[in-house]
């Protein structure tokens, strides 16, 4: 480049330049650190200028083009002699490397506008004059208005005699603004511009107007809003001191020794006091004064000086103590102890002998308001009368062993035989086994389960003899054998229907007799005239017995009774011609919930036209073993109806929340003195009722942890046994003997707990039945098995 361009004027630095500061050779240049290092931004220059405190401002162009020309302008008369080495080192830099760096700088600054202009100084050299910095939002410079008054804190009164009021940032005078006339002020007050305040700015002398930001701030303050944007007044509270009480030591320092070692200083002080007492300098007891000294001239007599202590009389009885005061004797008793106006009036009108207490409780509020007790002298006088006039008697305490008050029960070993172990397990049902029944001969066992099948097993061996599927969807809820050995008829309830079947596994003679009993009803049903149109239109007409389908008929099913509602209970009459069914569903009408079926006539009757009052829907029903009485149990009570007279005989109140089942003693009203029955409930209680004693239970037994599903007496009365089945997976065997003596009660003894069924789906043992001649019982469980207990 030519010398004219290279002769740029720079102001010299007032301090010496270090020799090695910022000088690198071309070989030492590391291109990895050049990212962002070359820049011609004015902000970089301004930051460098601010950091220098002891330097004269350098006004220069730091572009790559000027850096290339700096070598020629560093004369020896402009900078200290130490800078010559710096110029030499710069001249040793390779021209190619420096030119490449300058080319990169020029290319990077071509698209940006220069922030300076070149002028001539007094010597004719180029002078670079930079534009004024316009700070942005991120700059540290404050935005100063163009005509702002920069006089600072000088009062404006100093400029009253001058035509100007101050100076701007460039040092120019700010002239005093012209004042308007009164008409102009009136017009300004009428046409109020935006931001008008009516005040005068003391720094400029012009009317003070508010900016848009200030108006917005005033609006937020007036509307009770948050002035600052982005401020959240509902930030979560930082609990510097937590509100929860922390019970812990503030430090983990060990306990100091002075806490558990006697103090030496206190020991010294105590020893000083002890030494002073021994020397007589400190008297532990205050000597009596002259006033306290006794007067020897006064003669004193002791009335009991010669009185010898007399022993109590052998029959001496100490005086009884007064009872401690109660809440009603307090001067501020609780409100429930204060009498009402009615009680107070009744107490005042009653005779003193008839009053429950001799005073009325009063509330005085505080102890200082309590007056004197008017009956105090009277009570003390009566107390004295009681002490020396009333005879005293010693009461001897009865030393009775509580065990002797309990009835002596016989040992279970003396009450054998009863079932104690599992002998046979019956497996074959899919799902829960809901019901079972042992036939009158004691050879066969019928079961029904959730799979909709009825199975007949050989009792002793557990071999399945016969099976029929009655329903594809509904379970078999109950199966019962017809009483009597002359025929073998099985009744089963599955879904809405009752099925009567004769299993083809018995002798031909018994099978023929059973079929004859069932076929006799078809002839009677055919002879009955058809119902009239009025009777046919009734809602709850008795169902007609039907013949089964061909597939069921081939398997031994002989008749079907469509009840239209699900039956959960079925019980036969002792003669085998009647059986009663109960539909306990809540949607079942009350008039059809209980039905009595006649086997010889194929006839179904509904004895109840209305719902039984109290206790909810019916749950179970049984015939009396020797009387024409029907027992019907709902959720809370058991009612006995005389079928011959059609009257309600008795209502039993077991006190259970929900009755699950009940059974009548087989020898009721024959060998025993009255009727006895047992009741099982879902609230884990087993209740024994003696109808001759009371409507309430005679005994309540609570031995199970879960609901009781079934209870059963041993049939025939040969063995005084009964059992219950519970959801806890166990059976309880009891001894229950009754006698014909009206003065003696039933004897109930718990004998054995039988466990073997698994609890499945919160259900355990669902049904239980006894062998007709042996002390054996059979149980059905929710685990899909049946067990024979011997």
UniProtKB/Swiss-Prot annotation:
Top-rank taxon, per record: Eukaryota
PROSITE patterns (alphabetical): WD_REPEATS_1 (PS00678), WD_REPEATS_2 (PS50082), WD_REPEATS_REGION (PS50294)
Keywords noted in UniProt: Nucleus, Repeat, Ribosome biogenesis, rRNA processing, WD repeat
Oxidoreductase listed as a keyword: no
InterPro entries tied to this protein: BOP1/Erb1, BOP1_N_dom, WD40/YVTN_repeat-like_dom_sf, WD40_repeat_CS, WD40_repeat_dom_sf, WD40_rpt
Gene3D superfamilies: YVTN repeat-like/Quinoprotein amine dehydrogenase
Ranges of compositional bias, category Acidic residues: 46-84, 133-143
GO molecular function: large ribosomal subunit rRNA binding; ribonucleoprotein complex binding
Chain positions of WD repeats: 428-467, 471-511, 613-651, 654-699, 703-744, 760-790
Record has Nucleus as a keyword: yes
Predominant subcellular localization, coarse grouping: nucleus
Pfam family for this entry, one: BOP1NT
Record field: compositional bias (Basic and acidic residues): 117-130
Disulphide bridges: none
SMART domains reported for this sequence: BOP1NT, WD40
UniProt GO cellular component terms: nucleoplasm; PeBoW complex; preribosome, large subunit precursor
Compartments, as annotated in UniProt: Nucleus, Nucleolus; Nucleus, Nucleoplasm
Biased composition (Pro residues): 321-337
Function: Component of the NOP7 complex, which is required for maturation of the 25S and 5.8S ribosomal RNAs and formation of the 60S ribosome.
Record note on quaternary structure: Component of the NOP7 complex, composed of erb1, nop7 and ytm1. The complex is held together by erb1, which interacts with nop7 via its N-terminal domain and with ytm1 via a high-affinity interaction between the seven-bladed beta-propeller domains of the 2 proteins. The NOP7 complex associates with the 66S pre-ribosome.
Matching PANTHER family: RIBOSOME BIOGENESIS PROTEIN BOP1 (PTHR17605:SF0), RIBOSOME BIOGENESIS PROTEIN BOP1 BLOCK OF PROLIFERATION 1 PROTEIN (PTHR17605)
Family to which the UniProt record says this protein belongs: Belongs to the WD repeat BOP1/ERB1 family.
Protein name: Ribosome biogenesis protein erb1
Species in which this protein is naturally found: Neosartorya fischeri (strain ATCC 1020 / DSM 3700 / CBS 544.65 / FGSC A1164 / JCM 1740 / NRRL 181 / WB 181) (Aspergillus fischerianus)
Annotated gene: erb1
């Amino acid at each position: 480049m030519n010398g004219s361009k290279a002769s740029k004027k720079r102001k010299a630095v007032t301090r010496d330049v270090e020799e090695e500061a910022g000088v690198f050779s071309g070989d030492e240049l590391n291109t990895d650190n050049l990212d962002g290092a070359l820049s011609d931004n004015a902000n970089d220059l301004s930051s460098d200028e601010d950091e220098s405190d002891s330097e004269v401002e350098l006004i220069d162009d730091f572009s790559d083009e000027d850096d290339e020309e700096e070598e020629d302008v560093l004369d020896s008369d402009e900078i200290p002699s130490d800078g010559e080495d710096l110029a030499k080192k710069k001249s040793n830099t390779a021209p190619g490397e420096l030119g490449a760096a300058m080319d990169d700088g020029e290319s990077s600054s071509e698209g940006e506008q220069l922030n300076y202009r070149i002028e001539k100084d007094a010597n004719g050299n180029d002078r670079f004059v930079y534009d004024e910095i316009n700070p942005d939002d991120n700059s540290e410079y404050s935005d100063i208005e163009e005509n702002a008054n920069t006089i600072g804190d000088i009062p404006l009164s100093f400029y009253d005699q001058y035509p100007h009021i101050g100076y701007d940032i460039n040092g120019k005078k700010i002239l005093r603004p012209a004042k308007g006339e009164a008409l102009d002020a009136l017009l300004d007050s009428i046409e109020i511009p935006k931001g008008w305040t009516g005040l005068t700015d003391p720094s400029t002398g012009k009317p003070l107007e508010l900016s848009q930001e200030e108006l917005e701030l005033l609006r937020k303050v007036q509307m009770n809003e948050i002035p600052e944007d982005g401020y959240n007044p509902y930030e979560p509270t930082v609990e510097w001191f937590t509100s929860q009480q922390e019970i812990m030591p503030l430090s983990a320092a060990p306990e100091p020794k002075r806490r558990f070692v006697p103090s030496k200083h206190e020991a010294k002080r105590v020893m000083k006091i002890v030494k002073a007492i021994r020397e007589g300098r400190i008297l532990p007891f205050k000597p009596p004064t002259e006033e306290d000294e006794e007067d020897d001239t006064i003669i004193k007599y002791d009335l009991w000086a010669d009185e010898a202590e007399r022993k109590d009389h052998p029959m001496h009885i100490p005086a009884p103590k007064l009872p401690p005061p109660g809440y009603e004797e307090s001067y501020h008793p609780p409100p429930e102890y204060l009498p009402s106006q009615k009680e107070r009036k009744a107490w005042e009108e009653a005779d003193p002998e008839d009053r429950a207490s001799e005073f009325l409780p009063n509330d005085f509020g505080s102890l200082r308001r309590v007056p004197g007790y008017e009956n105090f002298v009277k009570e003390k006088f009566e107390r004295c009368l009681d002490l020396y006039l009333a005879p005293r008697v010693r009461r001897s305490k009865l030393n009775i062993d509580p065990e002797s008050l309990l009835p002596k029960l016989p040992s279970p070993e003396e009450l054998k035989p009863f079932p104690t172990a599992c002998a046979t397990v019956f497996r074959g049902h899919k799902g829960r086994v809901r019901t079972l029944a042992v036939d009158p001969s004691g050879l066969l066992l019928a079961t029904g389960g959730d799979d909709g099948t009825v199975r007949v097993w050989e009792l002793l061996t557990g071999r399945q003899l016969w099976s029929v599927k009655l329903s594809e969807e509904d379970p078999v809820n109950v199966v019962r054998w017809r009483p009597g050995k002359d025929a073998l008829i099985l009744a089963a309830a599955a879904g809405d229907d009752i099925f009567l079947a004769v299993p083809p596994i018995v002798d031909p003679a018994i099978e023929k007799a059973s079929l004859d009993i069932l076929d006799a009803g078809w002839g009677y049903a055919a002879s009955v005239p058809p119902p009239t149109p009025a009777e046919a239109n009734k809602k709850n007409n008795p169902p007609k017995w039907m013949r089964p389908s061909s597939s069921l008929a081939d398997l031994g099913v002989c008749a079907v009774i469509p009840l239209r509602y699900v039956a959960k209970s079925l019980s036969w009459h002792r003669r085998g011609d009647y059986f009663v069914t109960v539909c306990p569903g809540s949607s079942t009408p009350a008039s059809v919930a209980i039905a009595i079926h006649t086997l010889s006539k194929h006839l179904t009757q509904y004895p109840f036209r209305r719902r039984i009052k109290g206790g909810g829907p019916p749950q179970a029903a049984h015939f009396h073993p020797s009387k024409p009485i029907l027992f019907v149990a709902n959720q809370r009570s058991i009612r006995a109806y005389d079928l011959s007279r059609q009257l309600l005989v008795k209502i039993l109140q077991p006190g259970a929340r929900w009755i699950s089942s009940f059974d009548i003693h087989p020898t009721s009203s024959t060998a025993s003195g009255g009727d006895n029955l047992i009741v099982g409930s879902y609230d884990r209680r087993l209740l024994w009722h003696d109808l001759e004693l009371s409507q309430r239970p005679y005994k309540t037994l609570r031995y199970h942890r879960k609901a009781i599903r079934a209870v059963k007496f041993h049939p025939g009365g040969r063995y005084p046994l009964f059992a219950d089945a519970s959801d806890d997976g166990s059976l309880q065997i009891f001894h229950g003997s009754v006698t014909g003596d009206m003065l003696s009660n039933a004897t109930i003894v718990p004998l054995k707990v039988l466990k073997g069924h698994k609890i499945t789906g919160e259900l355990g043992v669902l049904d239980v039945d006894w062998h007709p001649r042996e002390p054996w019982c059979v149980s059905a469980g929710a685990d899909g098995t049946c067990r024979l207990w011997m």
